[in-house]
Amino acid sequence: MFEYLNGKLVKISPTNIVIDLSGIGYLISVANPYAWSALMNTEVKIYVHQVIREDAHSLYGFVNESEKALFLRLISVSGIGPKSALAIIAAADNEGLINAIDNSDIKYLTKFPGVGKKTAMQMVLDLAGKFDATGAVGISLLDAAPASNLALEEAIEALQALGYKATELKKIEKKLAQEAGLTSEEYIKSALKLMMK
């Protein structure tokens, strides 16, 4: 099983993206493929879940571990397969979905593609109360950026190793993420400038 892949985003289609990793193109189904557009031809980190069936080996991709955890919770519900779970993630704001499940809001849940009344009731039965205070196994809507920027992640880790606090770095991370295409060293320089202000 794979936990995540680090590779170059080389193709985007209506339902999938392709990550080139050491000359092999991995076709990965994702909730919102075009949300990855800004990262085309850059190194990305994508969390994955592999589904092996007799007729296919499929990879499903997620922007972070929390989105993956939500997906795994959804596919544990009878009547929800991987494609339906991706459609729900694509159509939902995760907080609203979690609130609807915890509050047994069947009407809200049946608005999702492929979710009828019976499946919505099963979602409530199987998942109500299974989410922590921050959401689906720790979902943070702030972390749900289109994809991880490998160079930025390396820069943040390097700054933490130098003794900068995670809270300080969180404050400037969004500003840094807007500066796409920089190397780790350039991100570090930019971060230091922002923290000096």
UniProtKB/Swiss-Prot annotation:
Does this entry carry the keyword DNA damage? yes
Q: Which GO terms describe its cellular component?
A: cytoplasm; Holliday junction helicase complex; Holliday junction resolvase complex
Q: Name one GO biological process term.
A: DNA repair
Q: Where is this region: Flexible linker?
A: 142-146
Q: Where is this region: Domain I?
A: 1-63
Under SUPFAM superfamilies, the record lists: DNA helicase RuvA subunit, C-terminal domain, Nucleic acid-binding proteins, RuvA domain 2-like
Where is the region Domain III? 147-197
Q: Which UniProt keywords apply?
A: Cytoplasm, DNA damage, DNA recombination, DNA repair, DNA-binding
Q: What Pfam families does the record point to?
A: HHH_5, RuvA_C, RuvA_N
What InterPro entries does this protein's entry cite? Answer: DNA_helicase_Holl-junc_RuvA_I, Hlx-hairpin-Hlx_DNA-bd_motif, NA-bd_OB-fold, RuvA, RuvA_2-like, RuvA_C, RuvA_C_sf
Asked whether the UniProt record includes Protein transport among its keywords, one would answer no
The GO molecular function terms of this record are:
ATP binding; four-way junction DNA binding; four-way junction helicase activity
Where in the cell? Cytoplasm
- Where does this chain mainly localize? cytoplasm
Q: Where is this region: Domain II?
A: 64-142
**Quaternary structure annotation from Swiss-Prot or TrEMBL:** Homotetramer. Forms an RuvA(8)-RuvB(12)-Holliday junction (HJ) complex. HJ DNA is sandwiched between 2 RuvA tetramers; dsDNA enters through RuvA and exits via RuvB. An RuvB hexamer assembles on each DNA strand where it exits the tetramer. Each RuvB hexamer is contacted by two RuvA subunits (via domain III) on 2 adjacent RuvB subunits; this complex drives branch migration. In the full resolvosome a probable DNA-RuvA(4)-RuvB(12)-RuvC(2) complex forms which resolves the HJ.
The domain-related comment in the record is: Has three domains with a flexible linker between the domains II and III and assumes an 'L' shape. Domain III is highly mobile and contacts RuvB.
Q: Which family does it belong to?
A: Belongs to the RuvA family.
Q: What does this protein do?
A: The RuvA-RuvB-RuvC complex processes Holliday junction (HJ) DNA during genetic recombination and DNA repair, while the RuvA-RuvB complex plays an important role in the rescue of blocked DNA replication forks via replication fork reversal (RFR). RuvA specifically binds to HJ cruciform DNA, conferring on it an open structure. The RuvB hexamer acts as an ATP-dependent pump, pulling dsDNA into and through the RuvAB complex. HJ branch migration allows RuvC to scan DNA until it finds its consensus sequence, where it cleaves and resolves the cruciform DNA.
What name does the UniProt record give this protein? Holliday junction branch migration complex subunit RuvA
In its UniProt entry, the species of origin is given as: Lactococcus lactis subsp. cremoris (strain MG1363)
Source taxonomy lineage?
Answer: Bacteria, Bacillati, Bacillota, Bacilli, Lactobacillales
Q: Its encoding gene is what?
A: ruvA
